[in-house]
Amino acid sequence: LLQARFKKSSKMKSVKAAMSQLQEGQYDIVLIMNADNVVDTNFLEVVNNTYASGSNAIQTHRIYQERPSNVSILNAITDEINNSILRAGHVNLGLSASLNGSGTAIDFTWFKENIRHLKDDDDEKVIESLLLRERIYVEYLNNTHVYALKNSGKKKFYTQHSTWIKTQYYSLFTNIGNLPGAILSGKFDYA
């Protein structure tokens, strides 16, 4: 267990610190999860089998466990809408699933090489853009669940969704210049 202790911490900063401690060739897959995540007993087997069948990037289905308040119910609904459209919907159309930052499995060698170039405040959207740019398809495992707890406070909800909106705009404006080239070269996922 590696404990990251930073004055100002971020998920990416912690992931980068962990990856710097791991040697290439030791592992096949990086699995990104949050500390509160719980998985089914066959979760790792399913992810490993999917990887072994040729998928280098995998997103599993995050489900919120506790829904004691209206805000947490809204949070769970929002996440299921995203699962339906941005993950299952994309895959049904032949496009890559969107990453959600939890229950995400990526080829170890690719991840270790690319994580070094990311900023400490980057998130899964930047990783997703890199995968798509390299035409690495993100598989979605709709029936492989990651159970997550969610802070149900209104302030936390609005902060998270404000960050999500900011990330969407950042991703749009960062990648919009690549749109014509992506379409012309047939990288429809990236477009």
Predicted regions: what they are:
Residues 30:
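Short aromatic/hydrophobic "clamp" motif used to bind/position activated sugar donors
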Residues 121-127:
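Acidic donor-binding loop at a coil-to-helix junction in glycosyltransferase catalytic cores
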Residues 34-50:
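Acidic donor-binding/catalytic loop of UDP-sugar-dependent glycosyltransferases
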Residues 128-146:
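Catalytic donor-sugar/metal-binding loop of nucleotide-sugar-dependent glycosyltransferases
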Residues 93-94, 152-191:
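Basic/Trp-rich segment in TM-proximal cytosolic loops or flexible interdomain/linker regions
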Residues 9, 37-39, 63-65, 126, ...:
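A short, conserved beta-strand element in the Rossmann-like catalytic core
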Residues 4-16, 22-27, 46-120, 162-173:
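Long helical/loop segments within the catalytic core of UDP-sugar-dependent glycosyltransferases
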Residues 14, 127-128:
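Short, hydrophobic alpha-helical packing/hinge segments within bilobed ligand-binding/sensory domains
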